[in-house]
Amino acid sequence: MDNYKIAETETFSKKIKSKKFNHLYSKILNDVYPIFRNNPFFGVNIKKLKGKYKEIYRFRIGDYRLFYTVNEIERIIFIINIENRQDLYK
């Protein structure tokens, strides 16, 4: 079985370079992306969203949430956004 490829959206790329999130990027590259390449659907920190966001998954990284979608046909994961948990529920 081929591994999934990872594509970062422009929104995510800009946000991860900001001071608020840049400390997470090495963790995402070294710890999260290897998990995604093997199986982006199942894991302790992976949850599929519901309702109008049912095509989006979220990955928990401590107090932060990484959001992504998966194109199963082309086997590509699109990293959409990252947010601090407390900012999501304001």
Task: List each language-model region with its residue ranges.
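Basic, Lys/Arg-enriched alpha-helical interface segments
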Residues: 1-57, 72-74, 87-90
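Short, hydrophobic/aromatic-rich beta-strand segments within well-structured domains
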Residues: 58, 65-70, 75-81
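Residue-level detector of conserved, well-ordered beta-strand and adjacent loop positions
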Residues: 50, 80-83
